[in-house]
């Protein structure tokens, strides 16, 4: 008798054979195209999808000196550098000449995507997933939807538009965007903001590269603390724009309060070029804190350590050199607290990177959905420096709790890799594709097994015919 068994492994409606991805964004992976977290998101998400085996096309405002089209990752990832003829007159990055680029983007991109990617893929029986990022792509996404409608192809494409922040929300035609795309965002905090606008976006979190889960060299961690001559004191770190929203004043005021307690403390501060930095450092001096600039033109770990050692006498070290990811991870791991808090944070990637390094993240209480107070970090609810002070005193008095928090932080970060984010995205795309009836449900795979008794009978029967 034949035994029938159904396979219960997870079955995907969206597969690498039946789906093509298109990502539309102003920012991208070129240094010319990077202006913030959006370019990093687009680069990491597209690479994660391509690594999974999906064909991926990325359209962005690329470096005018690089090829207009570049094929990567074994042909699975294609970079399309758009508006290069305009960018050559605007050498200062992606947002230099933004309005001119935006006009050309809206006029030329939708037709190209529909004619050269979407329509051919749909003709082959494939689903097309088109993902737009930030306000600059809203008009283009709506036009893509309209062009697909005109060709009778709209139900074979899933269009998601994602809000990473609230920048230029006033420039978006929300009625049209909501009709032509499925709106998404990166955290429940952003979802709640958009609820107030009559929108109900899907939440698809950001991620971090899986490589950031690798352990940080403890020898480098010890070396950093030795360079700071901290002698059992408290190291705080903050990496953010010089922006009032990032609560820099709270950071320097917490250092002053720790000093008043008789605790030795140092703040490693890496800001940007914004003028608010002058105000923050002036406030630090008013509080009686010493400030030093750490500078180096060399780009290696030894020079970074040396630069910090030269400033170790200061209470606040203003880091004036670029911090590559490998050195950032050492700072995150070596610090007693990484102040990743702000008054408005759509997601909070610094807090998650800190967790991945085994650091102690002090996040805000806005978009950092991954943070659980006293479990994998600390969640600051106010702008009062006494809150930071209190948590640091707690960690000093209960060092075992700090160790537990660091361990849980690493476990949490493992759930927020770009691979996990891509998997989440695919699940949401599948749901929408089913609503559009763009996916045909397949029956579970059936496997037949032959029992030993049946096999013996079959062999006997075969032998009798020989």
Regions found by a protein language model. Give the residues of each.
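Short hydrophobic beta-strand element within catalytic cores of glycosyltransferases
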Residues: 356-364
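Conserved acidic donor-binding segment of nucleotide-sugar-dependent glycosyltransferases
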Residues: 374, 378-385, 394-399
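A charged, aromatic-enriched C-terminal amphipathic alpha-helix characteristic of glycosyltransferases
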Residues: 400-437, 443-446
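A conserved catalytic-core segment of Leloir-type glycosyltransferases
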Residues: 2-21, 48-128, 297-314
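Short alpha-helical donor nucleotide-sugar binding micro-motif in glycosyltransferases
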Residues: 330-335
């Amino acid at each position: 008798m034949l035994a029938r068994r159904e396979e219960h492994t997870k079955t995907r409606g969206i597969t690498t054979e039946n789906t093509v991805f298109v990502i539309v964004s102003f920012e991208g992976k070129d240094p010319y195209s990077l202006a913030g977290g959006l370019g990093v998101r687009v680069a990491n998400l597209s690479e994660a999808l391509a690594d999974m085996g999906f064909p991926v096309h990325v359209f962005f405002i690329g470096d005018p000196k690089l090829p207009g089209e570049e094929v990567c990752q074994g042909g699975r990832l294609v970079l399309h550098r758009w508006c290069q003829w305009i960018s050559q007159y605007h050498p200062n990055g992606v947002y230099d000449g933004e309005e001119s680029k935006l006009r050309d983007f809206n006029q030329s991109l939708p037709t190209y995507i529909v004619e050269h990617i979407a329509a051919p893929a749909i003709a082959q029986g494939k689903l097309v997933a088109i993902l737009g990022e930030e306000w600059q792509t809203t008009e283009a996404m709506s036009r893509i939807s309209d062009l697909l409608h005109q060709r009778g192809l709209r139900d074979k494409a899933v269009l998601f538009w994602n809000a990473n922040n609230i920048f230029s929300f006033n420039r978006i035609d929300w009625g049209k965007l909501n009709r032509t795309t499925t709106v998404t965002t990166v955290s429940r905090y952003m979802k709640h903001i958009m609820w107030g606008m009559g929108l109900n976006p899907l939440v698809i979190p950001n991620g971090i590269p899986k490589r950031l889960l690798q352990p940080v060299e403890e020898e480098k961690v010890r070396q950093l603390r030795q360079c700071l001559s901290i002698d059992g004191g408290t190291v705080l770190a903050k990496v953010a724009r010089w922006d009032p929203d990032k609560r820099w004043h709270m950071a320097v005021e917490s250092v002053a309060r720790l000093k008043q307690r008789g605790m030795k403390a140092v703040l490693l501060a890496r800001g940007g070029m914004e003028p608010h930095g002058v105000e923050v450092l002036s406030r630090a001096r008013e509080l009686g804190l010493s400030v030093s600039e750490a500078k180096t033109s060399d780009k290696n770990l030894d020079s970074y350590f040396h630069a910090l050692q030269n400033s170790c006498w200061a209470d606040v070290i203003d880091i004036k050199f670029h911090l590559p990811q490998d050195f950032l991870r050492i700072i995150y791991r070596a610090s007693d607290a990484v102040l990743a808090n702000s008054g408005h944070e759509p997601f909070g990637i610094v807090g998650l990177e800190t967790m991945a390094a085994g650091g102690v993240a002090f996040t805000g209480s806005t978009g950092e959905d991954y943070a659980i107070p006293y479990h994998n970090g600390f969640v600051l609810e106010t702008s009062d420096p006494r809150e930071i002070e209190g948590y640091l005193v707690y960690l000093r008095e209960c060092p075992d709790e700090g160790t537990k928090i660091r361990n849980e932080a690493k476990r949490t970060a493992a759930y927020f890799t770009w691979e996990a984010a891509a998997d989440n995205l695919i699940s949401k795309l599948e749901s929408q594709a089913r609503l559009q009836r763009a996916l045909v449900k397949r029956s579970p795979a059936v496997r037949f097994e032959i029992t030993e008794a049946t096999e013996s009978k079959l062999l006997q029967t075969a032998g009798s015919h020989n």
